[in-house]
UniProtKB/Swiss-Prot annotation:
Residues 837-1925 form a coiled coil. Belongs to the TRAFAC class myosin-kinesin ATPase superfamily. Myosin family. Residues 81-776 form the Myosin motor domain. The keyword Heme does not apply. This is Myosin-9. Residues 27-77 form the Myosin N-terminal SH3-like domain. It comes from Gallus gallus (Chicken). The gene is MYH9. Keywords: Actin-binding, ATP-binding, Calmodulin-binding, Cell shape, Coiled coil, Cytoplasm, Cytoplasmic vesicle, Cytoskeleton, Motor protein, Myosin, Nucleotide-binding. One of its GO terms (cellular component) is cleavage furrow. InterPro entries: IQ_motif_EF-hand-BS, Kinesin_motor_dom_sf, Myosin_head_motor_dom-like, Myosin_N, Myosin_S1_N, Myosin_tail, P-loop_NTPase.
Length: 1959
């Protein structure tokens, strides 16, 4: 029952899926997916398509809705409902994936494969799918054999670890509450069950139990209830389970990350603290409560929400389970009580209350009961505890001072103490669990790591803990993306596979850099660490710095919704997260009252003091408070003795974790949360869709489908699957790649299913599983055949033994019977008595012979002894040689071991030296960087000095100007003020430069951090080298094993040592050479060791020099500080000068006549300036001298270090040469050993061949005997059951007729299926051609789209340029012509143009987005069609394989029928032979009977004669002589008769034996015939069923093909419609592009006009400046120039308007008719008339100049104000000048046209004509462009023609294919004819069976005659027993009986000979 419930939650009900009604409904309604707000996507049927939109009818309510085509997604057929692997879906889109997950979730199927990983949805209820029975179900199964499950993922990881010897990791990722922790527990449960060394279910090992019990303990102390999850892990853990070589668990290790210790003191609403607090308060007994001073829930301040319960969980029971788990873990009771005391102490810490005293801010403790409880529980003194909190000792300078704490500080200290205590306890617990799990002494070969880390958290406001958790999840998701998308595709490219790199756009590095980047700009964690070093830094300053540094980052935003609450927002992969930076600095530093820490370390409780043993690592409050105010941000670096922040520690932990994960093979489990209400059976589609998008599920499925996820190395592929292709690879050596190519050809795999790389074979998903199934089937067949051979061999052996026993028993019985007959016979007794006497006379002769034999034997013995002595001496010599060889081998092994040890030492020393070299190199690089920084700073200082000198010179020139111009005008005074402003700007620049210097110092610190990262990378390299060393050690072990095997082989080859003497001598010579080489190598090693010592000395020297350099660097830093001080002095002097300048100004304003005092002041200032210059020059010289000295020292140190490095490299090269020589020698020795082993293997191979031949002969002999016995049995059975056979024959005839009918029907069905197949193939070919067409069209569309995109980019660039120009024009127009109405009008026009441009740009963007959507949709559909094509190809190949199999079956049937016919012929021949034998025996019997009758008659005559003789007794004497003669004659006759009788009896016995054999043979033949008939019937039935099955499968496949064909036709139609739509879109886009180009040209013309205006304004501004510099007398000329400028502006405006109109008119007319020159001339005349009108307008404008003159007068009044603004405008003018230069570069042609226009204004008609001609040239260029476009169109037409030709060629190919199919049909007809012939042969066999019946009848007659003969023989035997025969006859019979044994043996031999002859 339980199993049935589990199956419900594992397997899919196939009956519901394979419902034909749903299939028909889907096909008829054209069902698709439509977006829905409620359920994500909704099913609907496609009714009508109207342009870009489609009308659909919703399936739920029948409403008709208009939807955009791009929003519609295809629906999969119903047979793909609830599919186990979403990679199998034909239509892969968001809607299908969501629907599949939803259907499975509602059916209770929570696990679903998604390509290479597994998706799990939290069911929020218990499911019966985790029992031991389920574990056993999944144990050792392949992935495709079982439904999706976490056990299947774990089993694949475990099997791949065992098979590939590669470390594995299982990463459970997802949001909080998605089920990661539960799946982690199931993984551990499965591994503990499968990999346990205790295989019995009841007896589980202690280690496995402890591993299972580690989770409940960690959950109790580290998990808590949150809003999203009732059992949320508030820490991360990485569980590493170690396995030995055999796959058994040998230990485990747990690493934890980022415990949320703040939860111990406060919790959010409706949340709990850690479970253990509630477990303890609920589950502790009364005695324990009193010992631990426990109180109710509401008495504890740290339990913010009181007693919050978890539904379905009892805290009391959980407490007992936790205590039991700790007992199983081996934690003693004392430590358990210590843990509980610490937990109670943490709760009591929250009850300590502080109050503020009245007069001061000092805190006090009015009630110390809670403190007393805490001190009692933790074993510390109360007074010391209260003193340490209220007045702690803080280090100030070198002294310690007691400082009173405020209430806030005391509260903070208590909370920090509670958090730190809980954290220390948790660390101790993890350490204790690791100690318990790592106690085994067995070495772990590999491990499986299980990662369970806190999921992604998005609360309303998030803190520092959430940032760390989300940062971790970002890194894990990046690892997933990297392994799934980047590494996968990189491996394809590295292996040389044809692959287009797909960018899925899932790079999360920007977000990771935002958090972790150390510099350039620094990330959030780096900024947080930097702020921790500033004493006055706050969370607010940290946020400001973050916004300043990262404000422009794309993943950083300011909060929009929660502006008042949140500080900043980060865009993570899972969404936007708002962060509140409250107490982040404190959380990052994590300070603690070190007075209390030392007090706890000195606790009387051993457990508490053990917890606080690492007091030195704790950051004290004095360290935080005592940070120097001068500490720069760049000084932040973690050295020894300095504290490390939480962020740094976590970054390092995370880096280690990511490194271990990268070194493993990851298996991803993506956990998904269905809803936030924690309700079972409810699924929020939008929530699930967001998680699927974030997790990259669709991309993972797509790369799994498109890529080749399964890959096998060549050697492994050949080794594993060569059984499937036995004759594909020829014998001998072959390259692995070539072998794999041959194997794949033999396997007949489709080329689309695999790719062959450089070292591996890559397969698509599911191909390897299919190969594994075929391999399993092959192995089962081979094993079954092997078992059958073994059983047959054993049966034959037993039968032969039984036969031998039977013959022996018969011989014994006969001999016993003969002895019983002879033992009472007197002659026999006499014979036994006389026989020994006869031997006495022979004994002397025998003794003589024996003596001679003895002499010969003694001689032989002496010779043998001599030989033995010689052999012993030879053996002794051999043994001595053997001992010598053993000693030499031992010596060699010892030498090798010593050499290996020396090599290992050398490698270790080499690694140490390399590390030292790396450190030195790193330090040298640091020194070089410092020197570079110092040089750069020097250059900057020199530049500053130069700038100061320049400033001083400028000030001097300003003073001179002041003295010269102070009398003339007050305007120059204002100018001097402006110069002062400029100086202030320069001061600001200097300040900015100072900031830049500080920033560079921060960059220096970041470089230092980068150097630290480099050191980490070096550590990674070290790890790699260690791994290399381990590999070398493994090689050494292998070599030792090989040596052991060599010794074994040497022992085996001792018998053949005489043949190997020469080789041994050669080996000895080689050994001697090796010894010489080893001695040389030892000398070289000693020399190398001496060099190493010298290098160590040099290293010490280098270290000393480095210290000296460091001291010099410190001196340089001091010099730098002094230079900074001097610079500050210079700045102060500069300020003083500025103040004096201001004073001078005031004096100038007061007194204009005091020039002498001013000159004196000036001379003083000049003297001061010269003094300053001299001091600066002196300082610069000294600085340069110091830098030169530093350079010299630094260069010397670098040279020395380079020499040391070169020496180490030489030593390294020598060592590597020695190592290579040793390895080459080892390789030579191994080659020689291999040659010896090959010789031995060849000998063994020959011996095995001979044994195999013998076995084959024995098998043939036994088979012959078996065939003989079987034939005998057949004859017997044929005799007994011929009638049954006749009935069976009749039945078989009827069945054969039925089979013939069925066969004909099947053949017709086959023809139909073949015709359908031909149609399908034609359709496929047509589809393939259409697909090619669509692909070509797609490529063309892609090209067009790319052109469109390029045009769009150009437009965007032009628009952006125009917008920038417009903005600049706006600024310039606003600044220069703010008072002019023309500028306002131009501004309005610009705004209108910009608005229209933006509108058009938005329209273009919308059109582009639409095109992109259609492109992506078409791409997806193309991918789906490609997948469908692959399926179609696979089905076709499967059908072809089935057809081949069917042909093979037919051929096998023919072979079987031929075999049966042969056997039948043999049986008939044997039956005929037996019949002839039986007839001959019957004749012999008749003759014997006749002889017997004659003998009886003769006996009667003898009796009568005897009676006559008795009657004539009286006449005895008369006729004695006659009687004796008669007697002799009678005796002779009796003897003859006796011999005849004996012969007859022998013949009778033989006939009886033959009869018995015939009966047995008949029975065997009959049984065999029955069996054959039954077998044939069964085979015919099976074949018929198989044929019916195949026909049904073919029908189903035909149905599928028809459906797929209809789908493909629909898809083709849709593609054609989409192509039409695309073409229309492209046409519209082309039109829009043309319009945009026209509009851009218009804008360019407008910009030219604006540039003219800008040029005019610039020139006017320059002229105004010139006029302002000159006297007021030149105002009149300026007015005239202004009038001219205004006239030119008006003329330019008019010319602009005129040019615009002319351009528009010209464009219109050229569009109408481009080739008409006459019209152009008319247009020219019209334009000339227009120019005349423009001249008239000029005259009108001249009238308006008077008004402008009035305005200019007003402007003259404003000139004074403008003079003040001119200086501010200068900087803008410089910027504008730069912009103008850029614009001049870009617009040279525009300037030329401007000049033409200006000349056109001056020289009226001629210039206009030239301008018009230039425009005509432009128009001609446009015409050229259009002709080019037409040429491109003609090219496209040619391409289309080429496509048409290709299509025609494809049509020809299709015709050829059709002809081929016709040939195949003809072949099938030929096969039908052959089958008909076989039927006729079967009828002939039936006729033969009738003949056989006749023979059977004759056999029956023979058996009846044999029975009669048997009766007669039995009567003869009875007569003999009665004694009716005379005495003489009986005596002869007795004499004859002594030889019966030998005769019967002879008969047996004769029979055996006959049997061999028949065989």
């Amino acid at each position: 029952m339980a199993q049935r419930d589990a199956d419900k939650y594992l397997y899919v009900d196939k009956n519901i899926i394979n419902n034909p009604l749903t299939q028909a409904d889907w096909a008829a309604k054209k069902l698709v997916w439509v977006p829905s707000e409620k359920s994500g996507f909704e099913a609907a049927s496609l009714k009508e398509e109207v342009g870009d939109e489609a009308i659909v009818e919703l399936a739920e309510n029948g409403k008709k809705v208009k939807v955009n085509k791009d929003d519609i997604q295809k629906m999969n057929p119903p047979k793909f409902s609830k599919v186990e692997d979403m990679a199998e879906l034909t239509c892969l889109n968001e809607a299908s994936v969501l629907h599949n997950l939803k259907e499975r979730y509602y059916s209770g199927l929570i696990y679903t494969y998604s390509g290479l990983f597994c998706v799990v949805i939290n069911p929020y209820k218990n499911l019966p799918i985790y029992s031991e029975e389920i574990v056993e179900m999944y144990k050792g199964k392949k992935r495709h054999e079982m439904p999706p499950h976490i056990y299947a993922i774990t089993d694949t990881a475990y099997r791949s670890m065992m098979q590939d010897r590669e470390d594995q990791s299982i990463l459970c990722t997802g949001e909080s509450g998605a089920g990661k922790t539960e799946n982690t527990k199931k993984v551990i449960q499965y591994l503990a069950h499968v990999a346990s060394s205790h295989k019995s279910k009841k007896d589980q090992g202690e280690l496995e139990r402890q591993l299972l019990q580690a989770n409940p303990i960690l959950e109790a102390f580290g998990n808590a209830k949150t809003v999203k999850n009732d059992n949320s892990s508030r820490f991360g853990k990485f569980i590493r389970i170690n396995f030995d070589v055999n796959g058994y668990i040998v230990g485990a290790n747990i690493e934890t990350y980022l415990l949320e210790k703040s939860r111990a003191i406060r919790q959010a609403k409706e949340e709990r603290t850690f479970h253990i607090f509630y477990y303890l308060l609920s589950g502790a007994g009364e005695h324990l409560k009193t010992d631990l001073l426990l109180e109710p829930y509401n008495k504890y301040r740290f339990l913010s929400n009181g007693h919050v319960t978890i539904p379905g969980q009892q805290d009391k029971d959980m407490f007992q389970e936790t205590m039991e788990a700790m007992r199983i873990m081996g934690i003693p009771d004392e430590e358990q009580i210590g843990l509980l005391k610490v937990i109670s102490g943490v709760l009591q810490l929250g009850n300590i209350v502080f109050k503020k005293e009245r007069n001061t801010d000092q805190a006090s403790m009015p009630d110390n009961t809670a403190a007393q409880k805490v001190s009692h529980l933790l074993g510390i003194n109360v007074t010391d505890f209260t003193r340490g909190i209220l007045t702690p000792r803080i280090k100030v300078g070198r002294d310690y001072v007691q400082k009173a704490q405020t209430k806030e500080q005391a509260d903070f200290a208590i909370e920090a103490l509670a958090k730190a205590t809980y954290e220390q306890m948790f660390r101790w617990l993890v350490m204790r669990i690791n100690k318990a799990l790592d106690k085994t002494k067995r070495q772990g070969a590999s491990f499986i790591g299980i990662l369970d880390i806190a999921g992604f958290e998005i609360f309303e406001l998030n803190s520092f803990e959430q940032l760390c958790i989300n940062y971790t999840n970002e890194k894990l998701q990046q690892l997933f993306n990297h392994t799934m998308f980047i590494l996968e595709q990189e491996e394809y490219q590295n292996e040389g596979i044809e692959w287009n790199f797909i960018d899925f756009g899932l790079d999360l590095q920007p977000c990771i850099d935002l958090i972790e980047k150390p510099a350039g700009p620094p990330g959030i964690l780096a900024l947080l660490d930097e702020e921790c070093w500033f004493p006055k830094a706050t969370d607010k300053s940290f946020v400001e710095k973050v916004v300043q540094e990262q404000g422009t980052h794309p993943k950083f935003q300011k909060p929009k919704q929660l502006k008042d609450k949140a500080d900043f927002c980060i865009i993570h992969y899972a969404g936007k997260v708002d962060y509140k930076a409250d107490e982040w600095l404190m959380k990052n530093m994590d300070p603690l009252n070190d007075n209390i820490a030392t007090l706890l370390h000195q606790s009387s409780d051993k457990f508490v003091s053990e917890l606080w043993k690492d007091v030195d690592r704790i950051v004290g409050l004095d360290q935080v408070a005592g940070m120097s105010e001068t500490a720069l941000p760049g000084a932040f670096k973690t050295r020894k003795g300095m504290f490390r922040t939480v962020g740094q520690l976590y970054k390092e932990q995370l880096a280690k974790l990511m490194a271990t994960l990268r070194n493993t093979n990851p298996n991803f489990v993506r956990c998904i949360i269905p809803n936030h209400e924690k309700k079972a059976g409810k699924l929020d589609p939008h929530l699930v869709l967001d998680q699927l998008r974030c997790n990259g599920v669709l991309e993972g499925i797509r790369i799994c489908r498109q890529g080749f996820p399964n890959r096998v190395v060549f050697q492994e592929f050949r080794q594993r699957y060569e059984i499937l292709t036995p004759n594909a690879i020829p014998k001998g050596f072959m390259d692995g790649k070539q072998a794999c190519v041959l194997m794949i050809k033999a396997l007949e795999l489709d080329s689309n299913l695999y790719r062959i790389g450089q070292s591996k074979v890559f397969f698509r998903a599911g191909v390897l599983a299919h190969l594994e199934e075929e391999r399993d089937l092959k192995i089962t067949d081979v094993i079954i055949g092997f078992q059958a051979c073994c059983r047959g061999y054993l049966a034959r052996k037993a039968f032969a033994k039984r036969q031998q026993q039977l013959t022996a028993m018969k011989v014994l019985q006969r001999n016993c019977a003969a002895y019983l007959k002879l033992r009472n016979w007197q002659w026999w007794r006499l014979f036994t008595k006389v026989k020994p006497l006869l031997q006495v006379s022979r004994q002397e002769e025998e003794m003589m012979a024996k003596e001679e034999e003895l002499i010969k034997v003694k001689e032989k013995q002496l010779a043998a002894e001599n030989r033995l002595s010689e052999m012993e001496t030879f053996q002794a010599q051999l043994m001595a040689e053997k001992m010598q060889l053993q000693e030499q081998l031992q010596a060699e092994a010892e030498l090798c071991a010593e050499a290996e040890e020396i090599r290992a030492r050398l490698t270790a020393k080499k690694q140490e030296l390399e590390e030292i070299c790396h450190d030195l190199e790193a330090r040298v690089e640091e020194e070089e960087e410092r020197c570079q920084h110092l040089q750069a700073e020097k250059k900057k200082m020199q530049q500053n000095i130069q700038e100061l000198e320049e400033q001083l010179e400028e000030e001097e020139s300003a003073r001179q100007k002041l003295q010269l111009e102070k009398v003339t005008t007050e305007a120059k005074l204002k100018k001097l003020e402006e110069d002062v402003i400029v100086l202030e700007d320069q001061n600001l620049k200097l300040a900015k430069e100072k900031k830049l210097l500080e920033d560079r110092m921060s960059e220096f610190t970041t470089n230092l951090t980068e150097e630290e990262e480099k050191s980490k990378s070096l550590a990674k390299l070290k790890n790699k080298h260690e791994a290399m060393i381990t590999d070398l050690e493994e090689r050494l072990r292998r070599e030792e094993k090989q040596r052991q095997e060599l010794e074994k082989t040497r022992r085996k080859l001792e018998g053949d040592s005489s043949d190997l003497h020469d080789q041994i001598a050669e080996l000895q010579a080689q050994i001697a050479e090796l010894k010489i080489q080893l001695s040389k190598k030892e000398e070289e090693l000693q020399a190398a060791l001496a060099r190493v010592e010298e290098e160590a000395a040099q290293k010490n020297m280098a270290l000393k020099k480095i210290r000296e350099l460091e001291s010099q660097i410190t001196e340089l830093q001091e010099d730098l500080e002094s230079e900074r001080a001097s610079r500050n002095k210079a700045e102060k002097q500069k300020r003083d000068l500025g103040e004096e300048l201001e004073a001078l100004k005031t004096e100038l304003e007061d007194t204009l006549d005091s020039t002498a005092a001013q000159q004196e002041l000036r001379s003083k200032r000049e003297q001061e300036v010269t003094v300053l210059k001299k001091t600066l020059e002196d300082e610069a010289k000294t600085h340069e001298a110091q830098i030169q000295e530093m350079r010299q020292k630094h260069s010397q140190a670098i040279e020395e270090l380079a020499e040391q490095l070169e020496q180490t490299k030489r030593v390294k090269a020598n060592l590597e040469k020695a190592k290579q020589a040793l390895e080459s020698e080892r390789a030579e020795l191994s080659n020689e050993v291999k040659v010896l082993l090959q010789g031995k293997g060849d000998a063994e191979h020959k011996r095995k061949k001979v044994d195999a031949q013998l076995q084959e002969l024995q098998v043939k002999f036994t088979e012959g005997e078996r065939v003989k016995t079987e034939l005998a049995e057949r004859v017997n059975k044929l005799q007994v059951e011929l009638d049954n056979v006749t009935g069976l024959l009749n039945q078989s005839d009827s069945k054969s007729i039925k089979l013939a009918k069925d066969f004909s029907a099947l053949e017709s069905q086959l023809q139909d299926t073949q015709e359908l197949l031909q149609e399908e193939t034609r359709l496929k070919l047509s589809f393939s051609t259409k697909l090619k067409q669509t692909e070509d069209e797609k490529n063309a569309l892609k090209e067009q789209l790319e052109e469109e995109e390029e045009a769009k980019r150009n437009l965007e660039k032009q628009i952006s340029v125009l917008q920038q120009q417009a903005v600049e024009a706006r600024k310039k127009m606003d600044d220069g012509l703010g008072c002019l109405e023309i500028a306002e009008e131009a501004k309005k026009k610009l705004q209108k143009d910009l608005e229209s441009l933006t509108q058009r740009y938005e329209e273009k963007i919308a059109a582009y987005d639409k095109l992109e959507k259609t492109k992506t949709r078409l791409q997806q559909e193309l991918d789906d069609i490609a997948v469908d094509l692959d399926h179609q190809r696979q089905t076709v190949s499967n059908l072809e394989k089935k057809q081949k199999k069917f042909d093979q079956l037919l051929a096998e049937e023919k072979n079987i029928s031929a075999k049966y016919a042969e056997e039948r012929d043999r049986a008939e021949a044997e039956a005929r032979e037996k019949e002839t034998k039986a007839l001959s025996l019957a004749r012999a019997l008749e003759e014997a009977i006749e002889q017997k009758a004659e003998l009886e008659r003769v006996n009667k005559q003898f009796r009568t004669e005897m009676e006559d003789l008795m009657s004539s007794k009286d006449d005895v004497g008369k006729s004695v002589h006659e009687l004796e003669k008669a007697k002799r004659a009678l005796e002779q006759q009796v003897e003859e008769m006796k011999t005849q009788l004996e012969e007859l009896e022998d013949e009778l016995q033989a006939t009886e034996d033959a009869k018995l054999r015939l009966e047995v043979n008949q029975q065997a033949m009959k049984a065999q015939f029955d069996r054959d008939l039954l077998g044939r019937d069964e085979q015919n039935e099976e074949k018929r069923k198989q044929l019916i099955r195949q026909v049904r499968e073919m029908e189903v496949e035909l149905e599928d093909e028809r459906k797929q064909r209809s789908i493909a036709v629909a898809a083709r139609k849709k593609l054609e419609l989409d192509l039409k739509d695309l073409e229309s879109h492209i046409d519209t886009a082309n039109k829009n592009r043309d319009e945009a180009i026209k509009h851009v040209r218009k804008l360019q013309a407008q910009m030219k006009d604006y540039m003219r205006e800008l040029e005019d304004t610039r020139t006017s501004r320059e002229e105004i400046l010139a006029q302002a510099k000159e006297n007021e007398k030149k105002l009149k000329s300026m007015e005239a120039e202004m009038i001219q400028l205004q006239e030119e502006l008006a003329a330019a405006e008019r010319a602009k308007r005129q040019a615009q109109q002319e351009r528009d008119e010209l464009a219109d007319e050229i569009a109408n008719s481009s080739g008409k020159g006459a019209l152009a001339m008319e247009e020219k005349r019209r334009l000339e008339a227009r120019i005349a009108q423009l001249e008239e307008e000029l005259e009108e404008e001249q009238g308006n100049t008077e008004i402008i003159n009035d305005r200019l007068k007003k402007a003259n009044l404003q000139i004074d104000q403008m003079n003040a603004d001119l200086n501010a405008e200068r900087s803008n003018a410089q910027k504008n000048e730069n912009a103008r230069q850029q614009m001049e570069r870009q617009n040279k042609e525009l300037k030329l046209k401007l000049q033409e226009m200006e000349s056109a204004v001056k020289s009226k008609y001629k210039a206009t004509i030239t301008a018009l001609e230039a425009k005509i040239v432009q128009l001609e260029e446009q015409l050229d462009m259009e002709t080019k476009e037409r040429q491109a169109a003609s090219k496209q037409v040619r391409r289309a023609e080429k496509k048409l030709k290709d299509i025609l060629l494809q049509v020809d190919d299709e015709r050829r294919n059709a002809e081929q199919f016709k040939d195949q049909a003809d072949k099938a007809n030929m096969r039908l004819k052959q089958l008909k012939r076989q039927l006729e042969e079967a009828e002939e066999e039936a006729q033969r069976a009738n003949v056989r019946r006749k023979l059977q009848r004759e056999l029956d007659d023979a058996t009846e005659t044999a029975d009669a003969m048997n009766r007669e023989v039995s009567s003869l035997k009875s007569k003999l027993r009665r004694g009716d025969l005379p005495f003489v006859v009986t005596r002869r019979l007795v004499r004859k009986g002594t030889g019966e044994c030998s005769d019967e043996e002879v008969d047996g031999k004769a029979e055996a000979g006959d049997a061999k002859a028949t065989e």
